[in-house]
UniProtKB/Swiss-Prot annotation:
Keywords: Cytoplasm, Nucleus
UniProt xrefs under Pfam families: CS (PF04969)
Region called Disordered, residue ranges: 392-420
Gene behind this protein: nudcd1
Compartments in which it is found: Cytoplasm; Nucleus
Gene Ontology CC annotations of this record: cytoplasm; nucleus
Keyword Cytoplasm: yes
Listed InterPro entries: CS_dom (IPR007052), HSP20-like_chaperone (IPR008978), NUDCD1 (IPR037895)
UniProt xrefs under Gene3D superfamilies: 2.60.40.790
PROSITE patterns: CS
The protein's name: NudC domain-containing protein 1
Main location: cytoplasm
Domain CS stretches: 276-365
Length: 585
Protein backbone atom coordinates (compact mmCIF):
# COMPACT_ATOMS: atom_id res chain seq x y z
CA UNK A 1 0.00 0.00 0.00
CA UNK A 2 1.28 3.47 -0.91
CA UNK A 3 2.16 5.65 2.05
CA UNK A 4 0.19 8.89 2.56
CA UNK A 5 2.06 11.85 1.09
CA UNK A 6 -0.40 14.69 1.60
CA UNK A 7 -3.34 15.73 3.73
CA UNK A 8 -6.69 17.49 3.57
CA UNK A 9 -6.34 21.16 4.51
CA UNK A 10 -9.45 22.53 6.18
CA UNK A 11 -10.43 26.10 5.32
CA UNK A 12 -11.07 27.51 8.81
CA UNK A 13 -13.08 30.38 7.37
CA UNK A 14 -15.74 27.84 6.36
CA UNK A 15 -16.01 26.30 9.85
CA UNK A 16 -18.27 27.79 12.52
CA UNK A 17 -16.94 26.83 15.99
CA UNK A 18 -19.87 28.64 17.65
CA UNK A 19 -22.61 26.68 15.92
CA UNK A 20 -25.13 25.52 18.52
CA UNK A 21 -27.84 23.36 17.00
CA UNK A 22 -30.61 23.07 14.46
CA UNK A 23 -34.05 24.41 15.32
CA UNK A 24 -36.96 22.20 14.30
CA UNK A 25 -39.19 24.07 11.88
CA UNK A 26 -42.86 23.16 11.53
CA UNK A 27 -43.13 24.84 8.13
CA UNK A 28 -44.73 22.42 5.71
CA UNK A 29 -42.81 21.19 2.68
CA UNK A 30 -44.93 21.05 -0.50
CA UNK A 31 -44.78 17.43 -1.68
CA UNK A 32 -46.00 16.15 -5.04
CA UNK A 33 -46.57 12.48 -5.82
CA UNK A 34 -46.27 10.91 -9.27
CA UNK A 35 -47.58 7.37 -9.65
CA UNK A 36 -45.48 5.34 -12.06
CA UNK A 37 -46.99 3.27 -14.89
CA UNK A 38 -44.54 0.45 -14.17
CA UNK A 39 -42.43 -0.37 -11.14
CA UNK A 40 -38.79 0.63 -10.91
CA UNK A 41 -36.40 -2.06 -12.18
CA UNK A 42 -35.26 -3.07 -8.71
CA UNK A 43 -33.01 -6.15 -8.55
CA UNK A 44 -32.81 -7.66 -5.09
CA UNK A 45 -29.72 -9.43 -3.84
CA UNK A 46 -29.47 -13.15 -4.53
CA UNK A 47 -28.57 -15.75 -1.91
CA UNK A 48 -25.09 -15.91 -3.44
CA UNK A 49 -24.62 -12.15 -2.92
CA UNK A 50 -24.29 -12.29 0.83
CA UNK A 51 -21.25 -10.15 1.62
CA UNK A 52 -21.10 -6.60 2.95
CA UNK A 53 -19.55 -5.55 -0.37
CA UNK A 54 -22.63 -6.80 -2.24
CA UNK A 55 -24.89 -4.81 0.07
CA UNK A 56 -22.84 -1.63 -0.32
CA UNK A 57 -22.52 -1.90 -4.09
CA UNK A 58 -25.94 -3.23 -5.11
CA UNK A 59 -28.21 -3.24 -2.04
CA UNK A 60 -27.64 0.48 -1.40
CA UNK A 61 -27.63 1.42 -5.09
CA UNK A 62 -29.21 4.77 -5.95
CA UNK A 63 -31.68 4.03 -8.78
CA UNK A 64 -32.32 7.73 -9.47
CA UNK A 65 -29.92 9.82 -11.57
CA UNK A 66 -29.94 13.60 -11.75
CA UNK A 67 -28.84 15.62 -14.76
CA UNK A 68 -26.04 18.02 -13.69
CA UNK A 69 -26.34 19.95 -16.98
CA UNK A 70 -30.11 20.56 -16.85
CA UNK A 71 -31.57 21.48 -13.47
CA UNK A 72 -34.55 19.61 -12.01
CA UNK A 73 -34.30 16.75 -14.50
CA UNK A 74 -34.02 13.15 -13.25
CA UNK A 75 -33.78 9.71 -14.87
CA UNK A 76 -34.48 6.12 -13.85
CA UNK A 77 -35.08 2.69 -15.42
CA UNK A 78 -38.36 0.82 -14.98
CA UNK A 79 -39.19 -2.89 -15.12
CA UNK A 80 -40.17 -2.65 -18.82
CA UNK A 81 -36.60 -1.74 -19.79
CA UNK A 82 -37.40 1.93 -20.37
CA UNK A 83 -35.14 4.85 -19.50
CA UNK A 84 -37.60 7.44 -18.18
CA UNK A 85 -37.13 11.16 -17.63
CA UNK A 86 -39.00 13.68 -15.50
CA UNK A 87 -38.21 17.36 -15.96
CA UNK A 88 -39.93 19.79 -13.60
CA UNK A 89 -40.83 23.27 -14.79
CA UNK A 90 -43.95 23.85 -12.69
CA UNK A 91 -44.59 21.84 -9.55
CA UNK A 92 -48.35 22.04 -9.79
CA UNK A 93 -48.35 20.71 -13.37
CA UNK A 94 -46.20 17.62 -13.17
CA UNK A 95 -46.65 15.22 -16.06
CA UNK A 96 -45.80 11.56 -16.40
CA UNK A 97 -42.16 10.55 -16.94
CA UNK A 98 -41.28 10.31 -20.65
CA UNK A 99 -39.55 7.37 -22.32
CA UNK A 100 -36.13 8.28 -23.73
CA UNK A 101 -34.78 4.84 -24.63
CA UNK A 102 -35.86 1.19 -24.51
CA UNK A 103 -33.58 -1.84 -24.16
CA UNK A 104 -33.94 -5.57 -23.64
CA UNK A 105 -33.21 -6.58 -20.07
CA UNK A 106 -33.31 -9.97 -18.34
CA UNK A 107 -33.26 -9.41 -14.59
CA UNK A 108 -34.12 -13.07 -13.97
CA UNK A 109 -30.60 -14.19 -14.80
CA UNK A 110 -28.86 -15.57 -11.68
CA UNK A 111 -25.96 -13.15 -12.14
CA UNK A 112 -28.01 -10.12 -13.19
CA UNK A 113 -27.50 -6.77 -11.48
CA UNK A 114 -29.57 -3.61 -11.53
CA UNK A 115 -29.46 -1.54 -14.71
CA UNK A 116 -27.41 1.63 -14.24
CA UNK A 117 -27.34 4.93 -16.09
CA UNK A 118 -24.61 7.57 -16.10
CA UNK A 119 -24.99 10.95 -17.80
CA UNK A 120 -21.65 11.38 -19.54
CA UNK A 121 -21.98 14.90 -20.94
CA UNK A 122 -24.67 17.37 -21.99
CA UNK A 123 -25.31 15.24 -25.10
CA UNK A 124 -24.19 11.69 -24.17
CA UNK A 125 -25.10 8.97 -21.67
CA UNK A 126 -23.81 5.50 -20.73
CA UNK A 127 -26.14 2.60 -19.91
CA UNK A 128 -25.55 -0.84 -18.40
CA UNK A 129 -28.27 -3.46 -18.84
CA UNK A 130 -27.19 -5.32 -15.67
CA UNK A 131 -26.02 -8.36 -17.66
CA UNK A 132 -22.62 -7.14 -18.82
CA UNK A 133 -23.54 -5.01 -21.85
CA UNK A 134 -22.45 -1.37 -22.12
CA UNK A 135 -24.36 1.00 -24.41
CA UNK A 136 -23.30 4.55 -25.24
CA UNK A 137 -26.19 6.82 -26.20
CA UNK A 138 -26.25 10.11 -28.08
CA UNK A 139 -28.97 12.12 -26.37
CA UNK A 140 -28.66 15.46 -28.21
CA UNK A 141 -29.07 18.48 -25.91
CA UNK A 142 -31.44 16.99 -23.38
CA UNK A 143 -32.82 20.31 -22.18
CA UNK A 144 -33.73 21.50 -25.67
CA UNK A 145 -34.62 18.15 -27.29
CA UNK A 146 -36.34 16.37 -24.45
CA UNK A 147 -38.90 14.94 -26.89
CA UNK A 148 -36.25 13.12 -28.99
CA UNK A 149 -35.41 9.46 -28.40
CA UNK A 150 -31.82 8.61 -27.61
CA UNK A 151 -29.66 7.03 -30.31
CA UNK A 152 -27.31 4.10 -29.46
CA UNK A 153 -23.83 4.69 -30.91
CA UNK A 154 -21.97 1.81 -29.25
CA UNK A 155 -23.13 -1.44 -27.67
CA UNK A 156 -20.88 -4.29 -26.60
CA UNK A 157 -20.77 -7.06 -24.01
CA UNK A 158 -17.85 -6.54 -21.63
CA UNK A 159 -17.92 -9.76 -19.61
CA UNK A 160 -19.32 -10.20 -16.12
CA UNK A 161 -22.23 -7.97 -15.02
CA UNK A 162 -21.32 -4.54 -13.67
CA UNK A 163 -22.74 -1.20 -12.64
CA UNK A 164 -21.49 2.14 -13.96
CA UNK A 165 -19.83 4.22 -11.28
CA UNK A 166 -18.86 7.27 -13.34
CA UNK A 167 -18.40 8.39 -16.93
CA UNK A 168 -17.32 11.46 -18.86
CA UNK A 169 -16.57 12.55 -22.42
CA UNK A 170 -13.92 14.74 -24.01
CA UNK A 171 -12.77 15.70 -27.50
CA UNK A 172 -9.14 15.90 -28.65
CA UNK A 173 -7.92 16.27 -32.24
CA UNK A 174 -11.47 15.72 -33.53
CA UNK A 175 -11.66 12.36 -31.74
CA UNK A 176 -14.61 11.98 -29.37
CA UNK A 177 -13.64 9.87 -26.35
CA UNK A 178 -15.83 8.44 -23.60
CA UNK A 179 -14.30 7.27 -20.32
CA UNK A 180 -16.38 4.82 -18.27
CA UNK A 181 -15.66 3.36 -14.83
CA UNK A 182 -17.30 -0.01 -14.08
CA UNK A 183 -17.68 -1.78 -10.73
CA UNK A 184 -17.81 -5.55 -10.23
CA UNK A 185 -17.85 -7.85 -7.20
CA UNK A 186 -16.50 -11.21 -8.36
CA UNK A 187 -15.71 -14.58 -6.84
CA UNK A 188 -12.03 -14.92 -5.94
CA UNK A 189 -10.87 -18.53 -5.36
CA UNK A 190 -7.53 -17.28 -4.04
CA UNK A 191 -9.24 -15.46 -1.16
CA UNK A 192 -9.51 -18.42 1.20
CA UNK A 193 -9.38 -16.42 4.44
CA UNK A 194 -11.80 -13.66 3.50
CA UNK A 195 -15.27 -13.53 1.98
CA UNK A 196 -14.23 -15.33 -1.21
CA UNK A 197 -14.96 -12.25 -3.31
CA UNK A 198 -12.85 -9.42 -4.70
CA UNK A 199 -13.83 -5.98 -5.95
CA UNK A 200 -12.66 -4.64 -9.30
CA UNK A 201 -12.92 -1.28 -11.02
CA UNK A 202 -12.50 -1.36 -14.79
CA UNK A 203 -11.61 1.85 -16.57
CA UNK A 204 -12.70 1.64 -20.21
CA UNK A 205 -11.90 4.12 -22.97
CA UNK A 206 -14.16 4.18 -26.03
CA UNK A 207 -13.57 6.53 -28.98
CA UNK A 208 -14.39 7.03 -32.65
CA UNK A 209 -10.85 7.20 -34.02
CA UNK A 210 -11.72 4.42 -36.52
CA UNK A 211 -12.92 5.49 -39.95
CA UNK A 212 -11.20 8.83 -40.43
CA UNK A 213 -12.16 9.13 -44.11
CA UNK A 214 -14.55 11.86 -45.17
CA UNK A 215 -17.08 9.40 -46.57
CA UNK A 216 -16.52 6.73 -43.93
CA UNK A 217 -18.67 6.84 -40.82
CA UNK A 218 -16.71 7.08 -37.62
CA UNK A 219 -17.44 4.03 -35.49
CA UNK A 220 -16.95 3.77 -31.77
CA UNK A 221 -14.81 0.98 -30.35
CA UNK A 222 -13.04 0.08 -27.13
CA UNK A 223 -9.49 1.45 -27.24
CA UNK A 224 -8.20 0.58 -23.80
CA UNK A 225 -9.23 -1.47 -20.77
CA UNK A 226 -7.54 -1.09 -17.39
CA UNK A 227 -8.50 -3.11 -14.30
CA UNK A 228 -7.77 -2.24 -10.69
CA UNK A 229 -8.60 -4.53 -7.79
CA UNK A 230 -9.19 -4.16 -4.07
CA UNK A 231 -10.83 -5.86 -1.11
CA UNK A 232 -13.66 -3.42 -0.42
CA UNK A 233 -16.28 -1.56 -2.43
CA UNK A 234 -15.03 2.01 -2.90
CA UNK A 235 -16.88 4.83 -1.21
CA UNK A 236 -16.01 7.05 -4.15
CA UNK A 237 -14.55 6.45 -7.61
CA UNK A 238 -14.36 8.85 -10.55
CA UNK A 239 -12.38 9.56 -13.70
CA UNK A 240 -10.69 12.95 -13.94
CA UNK A 241 -11.55 15.39 -16.74
CA UNK A 242 -9.79 14.54 -20.01
CA UNK A 243 -9.16 11.05 -18.61
CA UNK A 244 -5.91 12.12 -16.94
CA UNK A 245 -6.37 9.86 -13.93
CA UNK A 246 -8.69 8.07 -11.53
CA UNK A 247 -9.60 9.00 -7.94
CA UNK A 248 -10.64 6.25 -5.51
CA UNK A 249 -11.63 6.46 -1.83
CA UNK A 250 -11.95 3.11 -0.08
CA UNK A 251 -11.43 1.28 3.19
CA UNK A 252 -8.84 -1.00 1.61
CA UNK A 253 -6.35 0.06 -1.06
CA UNK A 254 -6.75 -0.49 -4.80
CA UNK A 255 -4.03 -1.14 -7.37
CA UNK A 256 -4.01 -1.60 -11.14
CA UNK A 257 -3.48 -5.24 -12.13
CA UNK A 258 -4.37 -5.53 -15.84
CA UNK A 259 -4.13 -3.52 -19.03
CA UNK A 260 -5.98 -4.79 -22.11
CA UNK A 261 -6.29 -8.27 -20.60
CA UNK A 262 -2.59 -8.64 -19.80
CA UNK A 263 -1.18 -8.65 -16.25
CA UNK A 264 0.45 -5.38 -15.35
CA UNK A 265 4.16 -5.99 -14.76
CA UNK A 266 6.88 -3.57 -13.86
CA UNK A 267 9.45 -3.39 -16.70
CA UNK A 268 12.90 -4.46 -15.50
CA UNK A 269 15.23 -1.48 -15.36
CA UNK A 270 18.95 -2.06 -15.24
CA UNK A 271 20.42 0.16 -12.59
CA UNK A 272 23.53 2.12 -13.37
CA UNK A 273 26.70 0.80 -11.80
CA UNK A 274 27.92 3.24 -9.18
CA UNK A 275 30.11 1.00 -7.06
CA UNK A 276 30.01 -2.15 -5.02
CA UNK A 277 28.49 -0.83 -1.82
CA UNK A 278 24.93 0.13 -0.99
CA UNK A 279 23.09 2.43 -0.65
CA UNK A 280 22.99 4.63 -3.73
CA UNK A 281 22.28 7.79 -1.74
CA UNK A 282 22.23 9.11 1.83
CA UNK A 283 19.71 11.60 3.12
CA UNK A 284 18.75 13.59 6.19
CA UNK A 285 16.07 16.14 7.00
CA UNK A 286 14.91 18.94 9.22
CA UNK A 287 11.43 20.39 9.63
CA UNK A 288 12.17 22.77 6.74
CA UNK A 289 14.16 20.79 4.17
CA UNK A 290 15.55 17.46 2.98
CA UNK A 291 19.17 17.00 1.91
CA UNK A 292 20.37 13.98 -0.03
CA UNK A 293 23.79 13.00 -1.33
CA UNK A 294 23.69 10.81 -4.46
CA UNK A 295 26.75 8.73 -5.33
CA UNK A 296 27.97 9.16 -8.91
CA UNK A 297 30.04 6.91 -11.19
CA UNK A 298 33.69 7.77 -11.61
CA UNK A 299 34.45 10.30 -14.31
CA UNK A 300 31.06 12.00 -14.15
CA UNK A 301 31.13 15.66 -15.17
CA UNK A 302 28.64 18.40 -14.47
CA UNK A 303 27.48 18.33 -18.10
CA UNK A 304 26.50 14.67 -17.69
CA UNK A 305 23.97 15.45 -14.96
CA UNK A 306 20.31 15.43 -16.03
CA UNK A 307 18.29 16.95 -13.17
CA UNK A 308 14.55 17.59 -13.20
CA UNK A 309 12.48 18.75 -10.22
CA UNK A 310 8.80 19.66 -10.02
CA UNK A 311 6.48 20.22 -7.07
CA UNK A 312 6.02 16.50 -6.50
CA UNK A 313 8.53 14.64 -8.72
CA UNK A 314 12.31 14.23 -8.80
CA UNK A 315 14.47 12.76 -11.56
CA UNK A 316 18.27 12.40 -11.51
CA UNK A 317 20.20 10.63 -14.27
CA UNK A 318 23.70 10.60 -15.74
CA UNK A 319 23.90 10.84 -19.52
CA UNK A 320 21.66 8.38 -21.29
CA UNK A 321 21.75 5.72 -18.55
CA UNK A 322 18.74 4.66 -16.51
CA UNK A 323 17.82 7.27 -13.86
CA UNK A 324 19.47 7.01 -10.45
CA UNK A 325 16.36 8.55 -8.88
CA UNK A 326 13.01 8.89 -10.57
CA UNK A 327 9.54 9.11 -9.09
CA UNK A 328 6.98 10.75 -6.88
CA UNK A 329 8.31 12.65 -3.86
CA UNK A 330 6.98 11.81 -0.41
CA UNK A 331 5.50 15.31 -0.10
CA UNK A 332 5.40 18.51 -2.19
CA UNK A 333 8.48 20.75 -2.35
CA UNK A 334 9.27 24.26 -3.56
CA UNK A 335 11.30 23.86 -6.80
CA UNK A 336 12.38 27.51 -6.80
CA UNK A 337 13.96 27.26 -3.34
CA UNK A 338 15.59 23.86 -3.97
CA UNK A 339 19.16 23.51 -5.28
CA UNK A 340 21.72 20.92 -6.40
CA UNK A 341 25.51 21.00 -6.46
CA UNK A 342 28.25 18.55 -7.50
CA UNK A 343 30.93 17.68 -4.95
CA UNK A 344 34.44 16.65 -6.16
CA UNK A 345 33.08 14.58 -9.08
CA UNK A 346 31.91 11.79 -6.76
CA UNK A 347 28.55 12.87 -5.41
CA UNK A 348 25.58 15.09 -6.15
CA UNK A 349 24.13 17.06 -3.24
CA UNK A 350 20.45 17.96 -3.56
CA UNK A 351 18.63 20.28 -1.16
CA UNK A 352 14.82 20.07 -1.28
CA UNK A 353 12.81 22.81 0.40
CA UNK A 354 9.60 21.40 1.92
CA UNK A 355 6.43 23.21 0.91
CA UNK A 356 4.89 22.48 4.34
CA UNK A 357 7.10 22.68 7.40
CA UNK A 358 6.83 20.15 10.21
CA UNK A 359 5.91 16.66 8.98
CA UNK A 360 8.89 14.31 8.71
CA UNK A 361 9.37 12.19 5.62
CA UNK A 362 9.71 8.41 5.84
CA UNK A 363 11.33 8.24 2.38
CA UNK A 364 12.42 10.61 -0.38
CA UNK A 365 10.97 8.95 -3.48
CA UNK A 366 7.91 6.78 -2.94
CA UNK A 367 8.83 3.10 -3.18
CA UNK A 368 12.60 3.71 -3.49
CA UNK A 369 14.44 1.81 -0.73
CA UNK A 370 17.99 2.35 -2.04
CA UNK A 371 18.75 5.27 0.24
CA UNK A 372 19.99 5.36 3.82
CA UNK A 373 18.50 7.82 6.28
CA UNK A 374 21.00 9.53 8.59
CA UNK A 375 19.62 10.82 11.91
CA UNK A 376 21.30 13.50 13.98
CA UNK A 377 21.57 13.18 17.77
CA UNK A 378 18.51 15.34 18.42
CA UNK A 379 16.32 13.23 16.13
CA UNK A 380 17.59 10.03 17.74
CA UNK A 381 16.71 11.40 21.18
CA UNK A 382 13.19 12.35 20.04
CA UNK A 383 12.68 8.90 18.57
CA UNK A 384 13.80 7.21 21.79
CA UNK A 385 11.35 9.32 23.80
CA UNK A 386 8.49 8.37 21.49
CA UNK A 387 9.31 4.67 21.86
CA UNK A 388 10.01 4.75 25.61
CA UNK A 389 6.54 3.45 26.42
CA UNK A 390 7.49 0.14 24.79
CA UNK A 391 10.12 -0.57 27.47
CA UNK A 392 9.89 -0.61 31.26
CA UNK A 393 12.11 -1.48 34.20
CA UNK A 394 9.15 -2.81 36.22
CA UNK A 395 8.55 -6.54 36.17
CA UNK A 396 4.79 -6.00 36.14
CA UNK A 397 3.96 -2.50 34.88
CA UNK A 398 0.28 -3.41 34.51
CA UNK A 399 -0.97 -5.18 37.66
CA UNK A 400 -4.55 -5.10 36.35
CA UNK A 401 -3.77 -7.16 33.26
CA UNK A 402 -5.36 -10.26 34.83
CA UNK A 403 -8.66 -8.38 34.93
CA UNK A 404 -9.64 -7.83 31.30
CA UNK A 405 -12.00 -4.88 30.75
CA UNK A 406 -14.28 -7.00 28.56
CA UNK A 407 -14.97 -10.54 27.48
CA UNK A 408 -13.05 -11.18 24.26
CA UNK A 409 -15.64 -13.75 23.20
CA UNK A 410 -18.26 -10.99 23.06
CA UNK A 411 -16.27 -9.00 20.49
CA UNK A 412 -17.44 -9.04 16.89
CA UNK A 413 -15.67 -8.20 13.64
CA UNK A 414 -17.01 -4.65 13.70
CA UNK A 415 -15.29 -4.08 17.08
CA UNK A 416 -11.84 -4.73 15.63
CA UNK A 417 -9.66 -2.08 14.05
CA UNK A 418 -9.54 -2.40 10.26
CA UNK A 419 -6.40 -3.89 8.73
CA UNK A 420 -5.99 -0.90 6.43
CA UNK A 421 -6.95 2.68 7.16
CA UNK A 422 -9.33 4.30 4.68
CA UNK A 423 -7.44 6.12 1.96
CA UNK A 424 -8.10 8.61 -0.79
CA UNK A 425 -5.84 7.90 -3.78
CA UNK A 426 -5.27 9.65 -7.07
CA UNK A 427 -3.87 7.36 -9.82
CA UNK A 428 -2.01 8.85 -12.77
CA UNK A 429 -3.58 7.85 -16.07
CA UNK A 430 -0.24 7.30 -17.82
CA UNK A 431 1.74 5.39 -15.18
CA UNK A 432 -1.30 3.86 -13.38
CA UNK A 433 0.55 4.55 -10.12
CA UNK A 434 -0.81 6.47 -7.11
CA UNK A 435 0.83 9.89 -6.95
CA UNK A 436 -1.39 11.49 -4.32
CA UNK A 437 -2.43 9.53 -1.23
CA UNK A 438 -4.42 10.83 1.74
CA UNK A 439 -5.14 8.84 4.88
CA UNK A 440 -8.76 9.50 5.80
CA UNK A 441 -8.36 7.97 9.26
CA UNK A 442 -11.50 8.66 11.25
CA UNK A 443 -13.00 10.97 8.60
CA UNK A 444 -16.11 8.98 7.76
CA UNK A 445 -17.26 9.14 4.14
CA UNK A 446 -20.82 10.50 3.89
CA UNK A 447 -21.78 11.05 0.24
CA UNK A 448 -20.68 12.32 -3.17
CA UNK A 449 -22.42 14.92 -5.32
CA UNK A 450 -22.03 16.75 -8.65
CA UNK A 451 -21.45 20.44 -7.96
CA UNK A 452 -20.06 21.49 -11.35
CA UNK A 453 -20.62 19.08 -14.28
CA UNK A 454 -17.29 20.11 -15.82
CA UNK A 455 -15.41 18.87 -12.75
CA UNK A 456 -15.00 15.61 -10.88
CA UNK A 457 -17.81 14.89 -8.38
CA UNK A 458 -17.27 16.37 -4.93
CA UNK A 459 -17.34 14.21 -1.80
CA UNK A 460 -18.37 14.86 1.79
CA UNK A 461 -16.42 13.63 4.83
CA UNK A 462 -17.13 13.84 8.53
CA UNK A 463 -14.64 16.03 10.43
CA UNK A 464 -15.35 15.92 14.15
CA UNK A 465 -19.05 16.87 14.37
CA UNK A 466 -19.22 18.70 11.04
CA UNK A 467 -19.52 17.46 7.46
CA UNK A 468 -17.01 19.02 5.07
CA UNK A 469 -17.43 19.04 1.30
CA UNK A 470 -14.27 18.53 -0.79
CA UNK A 471 -13.81 19.25 -4.49
CA UNK A 472 -10.96 17.42 -6.29
CA UNK A 473 -8.94 19.80 -8.45
CA UNK A 474 -6.26 17.66 -10.15
CA UNK A 475 -4.81 20.62 -12.05
CA UNK A 476 -3.83 22.40 -8.81
CA UNK A 477 -0.56 20.83 -7.66
CA UNK A 478 -0.51 22.69 -4.36
CA UNK A 479 -4.17 22.13 -3.42
CA UNK A 480 -5.61 19.12 -5.21
CA UNK A 481 -8.29 18.65 -2.51
CA UNK A 482 -10.18 21.92 -1.93
CA UNK A 483 -12.54 22.42 1.00
CA UNK A 484 -15.52 24.23 -0.57
CA UNK A 485 -18.33 24.07 2.01
CA UNK A 486 -19.32 22.95 5.51
CA UNK A 487 -22.55 21.54 6.88
CA UNK A 488 -22.53 22.32 10.57
CA UNK A 489 -22.94 19.34 12.93
CA UNK A 490 -24.17 17.11 10.08
CA UNK A 491 -21.52 14.51 10.90
CA UNK A 492 -22.91 14.24 14.41
CA UNK A 493 -26.55 14.35 13.32
CA UNK A 494 -26.30 11.66 10.65
CA UNK A 495 -24.62 9.26 13.07
CA UNK A 496 -27.85 9.11 15.08
CA UNK A 497 -29.94 8.11 12.03
CA UNK A 498 -29.70 4.34 12.29
CA UNK A 499 -32.05 3.81 9.33
CA UNK A 500 -30.29 6.29 7.04
CA UNK A 501 -29.95 5.05 3.46
CA UNK A 502 -28.99 8.08 1.34
CA UNK A 503 -27.47 11.51 1.92
CA UNK A 504 -26.92 14.43 -0.43
CA UNK A 505 -26.82 18.23 -0.64
CA UNK A 506 -27.87 21.05 -2.95
CA UNK A 507 -25.29 22.13 -5.56
CA UNK A 508 -25.37 25.65 -4.07
CA UNK A 509 -24.82 24.25 -0.52
CA UNK A 510 -28.05 25.80 0.77
CA UNK A 511 -29.09 22.58 2.50
CA UNK A 512 -28.16 18.96 3.12
CA UNK A 513 -30.64 16.11 3.26
CA UNK A 514 -30.83 12.59 4.70
CA UNK A 515 -33.27 9.88 3.71
CA UNK A 516 -34.20 6.80 5.70
CA UNK A 517 -34.94 3.41 4.19
CA UNK A 518 -38.64 4.03 4.62
CA UNK A 519 -40.71 7.19 4.36
CA UNK A 520 -38.83 9.91 6.31
CA UNK A 521 -36.68 12.70 4.84
CA UNK A 522 -34.62 15.12 6.96
CA UNK A 523 -33.55 18.54 5.65
CA UNK A 524 -30.83 20.61 7.34
CA UNK A 525 -30.57 24.19 6.15
CA UNK A 526 -27.62 26.54 6.38
CA UNK A 527 -27.93 29.30 9.02
CA UNK A 528 -30.02 32.23 7.81
CA UNK A 529 -30.91 35.64 9.33
CA UNK A 530 -34.02 35.74 11.52
CA UNK A 531 -36.89 38.17 11.02
CA UNK A 532 -37.46 38.77 14.72
CA UNK A 533 -35.18 39.51 17.66
CA UNK A 534 -33.96 36.37 19.43
CA UNK A 535 -31.99 36.48 22.66
CA UNK A 536 -29.87 33.69 24.16
CA UNK A 537 -30.45 34.09 27.90
CA UNK A 538 -27.76 31.59 28.90
CA UNK A 539 -25.00 33.39 27.02
CA UNK A 540 -26.52 36.85 27.27
CA UNK A 541 -26.30 37.65 23.56
CA UNK A 542 -28.58 38.29 20.64
CA UNK A 543 -28.95 35.54 18.05
CA UNK A 544 -28.62 36.80 14.49
CA UNK A 545 -28.89 33.52 12.55
CA UNK A 546 -30.76 30.26 12.98
CA UNK A 547 -30.22 26.92 11.23
CA UNK A 548 -33.48 25.09 10.62
CA UNK A 549 -34.26 21.39 10.45
CA UNK A 550 -37.35 20.06 8.66
CA UNK A 551 -38.84 16.57 8.48
CA UNK A 552 -41.03 15.22 5.69
CA UNK A 553 -43.04 12.00 5.84
CA UNK A 554 -43.83 10.43 2.49
CA UNK A 555 -47.20 8.82 1.89
CA UNK A 556 -45.89 5.37 0.96
CA UNK A 557 -44.98 2.03 2.48
CA UNK A 558 -42.46 1.15 -0.24
CA UNK A 559 -38.74 1.39 0.51
CA UNK A 560 -36.79 4.31 -0.91
CA UNK A 561 -34.74 3.37 -3.99
CA UNK A 562 -33.40 6.74 -5.14
CA UNK A 563 -32.64 10.15 -3.66
CA UNK A 564 -31.33 13.29 -5.41
CA UNK A 565 -31.26 17.03 -4.73
CA UNK A 566 -31.25 20.24 -6.75
CA UNK A 567 -31.11 23.81 -5.49
CA UNK A 568 -34.91 23.99 -5.26
CA UNK A 569 -36.18 20.40 -5.03
CA UNK A 570 -35.65 16.96 -3.56
CA UNK A 571 -36.52 13.89 -5.64
CA UNK A 572 -37.36 10.64 -3.84
CA UNK A 573 -37.92 7.44 -5.83
CA UNK A 574 -39.77 4.42 -4.45
CA UNK A 575 -40.85 1.22 -6.18
CA UNK A 576 -44.08 2.70 -7.58
CA UNK A 577 -43.85 6.46 -6.97
CA UNK A 578 -41.67 9.47 -7.59
CA UNK A 579 -41.99 12.22 -4.97
CA UNK A 580 -40.97 15.84 -5.60
CA UNK A 581 -40.36 18.01 -2.52
CA UNK A 582 -40.25 21.77 -3.02
CA UNK A 583 -37.46 22.76 -0.63
CA UNK A 584 -36.55 26.28 -1.79
CA UNK A 585 -38.40 28.93 -3.77
Amino acid sequence: MALPNCSLNVNRELVDPNFESYRLSLDSIPTYNIELDAAVAEVKLKDSQYTLDHVRAFGMFNYLQIDPWYEDSVYFVDSKGRVLNLTVTLDTALGKPREMFHFESDSSSPEALCASLSLTSATWAALSDGNGKLTLLRTSKRGESSHLKWEPMFSESLGDPFIIVHSLAHVHSNVHTVEVLLLRVQKDPSDTKGSGFSVSLEWITVDNSAGQGESEEKKYAVRKRRVMKGKSVPHYAAVEPQGKGVIVASEKPFAFTEVDGLPLEEPPVQDMEVGNSDPIYFWQQTEEDVTLCVRLPEGTTKDDIRFKLTVDCLRVRVGDYAPLLDGQLFAPVDPEASTWTMNDDKSLEVSLQKRSEGPLWSEVVLGDRRGEYLMNDEQKSQLQQRLSYLTSEDLNPNPEKDKPPCNAQELEDCDMSPEDSSTLMRFDGATLKPNNVVSLGSNQFLFSVHIDPSETPAFCLRHDVDALLWQPRPDQDNNIWEHISTFNALGYVQASKRDKKFATCAPNFSYAALCECLRRVFIYRQPSPVDTVLFNRKQGRQVGQVAKQQVANLDTNDPVLGFRATNERLFVLTLNNLFVLKVNN
